C-alpha cells in the first residue's frame, strides 16, 4: 500500500514539476509579434479571440498584465492536477470494469474504452474547440500532444530508464502505420480550411478499421511474420521472442507482471485461480485490491503531505459526488462512476481551456501555440508517467505501444465533434478551421512518425538513452519550428486579434 501511495504522490509531484517548466516554454527567448495580420490568399483577416466565448474572468487585461496572470497559471496547474486525480482514481477503474463486463479482449478494450481514459482530456478539449471556442485549440492540442507522445515520451523513457529494453517490430510497425494513415487523413481534411461531414466520418471509419485489425491481430501478425521474416531480420527475431516468452511472468520479488508480448495500450488480465487480479492501465502498473486505502489517509512524508493538502478540495469533491468503484461496496455502480467522472473531466477541462485561452490572449500568444505547448504536454502527463514506469521494468514494447498506439484514438477525438457538428448541427455545412499552421504541424507529425520508426530500427530495436537523446533533440526542433511558424516569425502566417 505504501509503495502504491508513494508512486501516486510521486506521479503528481512529477506532474506539477513538468507543468511548471512547460508553462514558461512560449516565453523563453522569444520576441512576440504585436497583433499582426494573418495572410489568407490575397487578403488579410483578423482572428476573433476565443476568449469572447468564455465568461469575462475576474481580472481586467491590465490587471492580468500587472501580475494577476500568476493566478491564472496557478489555476491551470491545479486543473491539470484535478484531471489527473479524477482519471487515475475514478475514470480508468470504471472503464476497466466496463471492459470486463462486456468481455472485451485486451486489444479491443485497450483501443476503445481504455484509450478513452487516457484521451478524455483531449476529447473534451476537441469538443470545446469545435462547439464553444470555435477555434483551433482542440485541433492544435491533439496534434501537438501527438508529436509530444511520439518523440517527447520516447525521450523520457530512454533517458529516465536504467534498463535497455528490446523492442518487437510488428506492434511498432502496426501502430505507426495506423497513425500515419490517420495523420495523413487529417492533413487532407484541414488543408482547405473546411471540414465536411463525410471527412469527420472518414476519421471514425479509420479508427473502426484499426479496432478490426486488433481483433484479428494474432492471425495478421503470424501471417505477416511468415511472409516477411525471410527478408526482414527484425520480424524473424520477433517470432523467436514470441515463441520463447509467455504472456504472464513473475518478477524476482514474486510479483506477477505482464510480459512484453502484450502489445496494447492497456488491458485487463486475470491470473489463474488463487491469485489476485492484475490490471494494466494507461496510467501505469498497479496491483488492484478489493478495498483501496481511504483517500483521506494523510501521507507520512512531508512533501507528500503538501501535495495531499493542496489536492484535498478536489479529493473531497470527488469523494462526495462520485462512487469509488474500486471498493467492493461500490463496484456495481461503475456506470455512475463512469458518467460522473466524465462530467468532472469535462468541467475541469472547460476551466483549463478557459484559463489557457485568457492567458494566451494576455501574453498575445495565439491559442494554437498554447495548445502546442502547455495543453499538449499537460494532457500527456499520465501517458508519460505510465510509459516511463513500464520502461524501467524492461517492458519496452508496452511503453512504445502506449506512446504510439494511444495517438490513434486522438484522431477519434477530432472525428466525433467534427462529424456531429457538420452532420447534425450545421445542416451539412462545413466546419471552419482557421489555422494554416496546423497543416505544417500535421506534416511535421508524419515526418516524426517515420523518423521514430527509422530511429528505432537503426538503433538495433533497443529503447535506451541513445534513442532518448535523439528523440529529445528531434522533439525540441519540431516544437520550436511549429511555434515559430504559428507566431509568424517564419513563413507568412502572422496573426492579429480583431479589434486590436
Swiss-Prot record:
Transmembrane segments: 67-87, 112-132, 137-157, 170-190, 196-216, 303-323, 334-354, 369-389, 400-420, 438-458, 469-489
Record-level Gene Ontology MF annotations: calcium channel activity; calcium, potassium:sodium antiporter activity; symporter activity
Keyword Transmembrane appears in the UniProt entry: yes
GO cellular component terms listed in the entry, alphabetical order: melanosome; trans-Golgi network; trans-Golgi network membrane
Protein's GO biological process: calcium ion import; calcium ion transmembrane transport; intracellular calcium ion homeostasis; melanin biosynthetic process; monoatomic ion transmembrane transport; monoatomic ion transport; negative regulation of melanin biosynthetic process
Key words of the record: Albinism, Antiport, Calcium, Calcium transport, Golgi apparatus, Ion transport, Membrane, Potassium, Potassium transport, Sensory transduction, Signal, Sodium, Sodium transport, Symport, Transmembrane, Transmembrane helix, Transport
Chain ranges on the Cytoplasmic side, renumbered to this chain: 88-111, 158-169, 217-302, 355-368, 421-437, 490-500
Lipid bilayer topology: Multi-pass membrane protein
Stretches in topological domain Extracellular: 30-66, 133-136, 191-195, 324-333, 390-399, 459-468
Protein's cellular compartments: Golgi apparatus, trans-Golgi network membrane; Melanosome
InterPro entries: K/Na/Ca-exchanger, NaCa_Exmemb, NCX_ion-bd_dom_sf
Function summary: Calcium, potassium:sodium antiporter that transports 1 Ca(2+) and 1 K(+) to the melanosome in exchange for 4 cytoplasmic Na(+). Involved in pigmentation, possibly by participating in ion transport in melanosomes. Predominant sodium-calcium exchanger in melanocytes.
Implicated disorder: Albinism, oculocutaneous, 6: A disorder characterized by a reduction or complete loss of melanin in the skin, hair and eyes. Patients show reduced or lacking pigmentation often accompanied by eye symptoms such as photophobia, strabismus, moderate to severe visual impairment, and nystagmus.
The protein, known as: Sodium/potassium/calcium exchanger 5
Source organism: Homo sapiens
Gene encoding the protein: SLC24A5
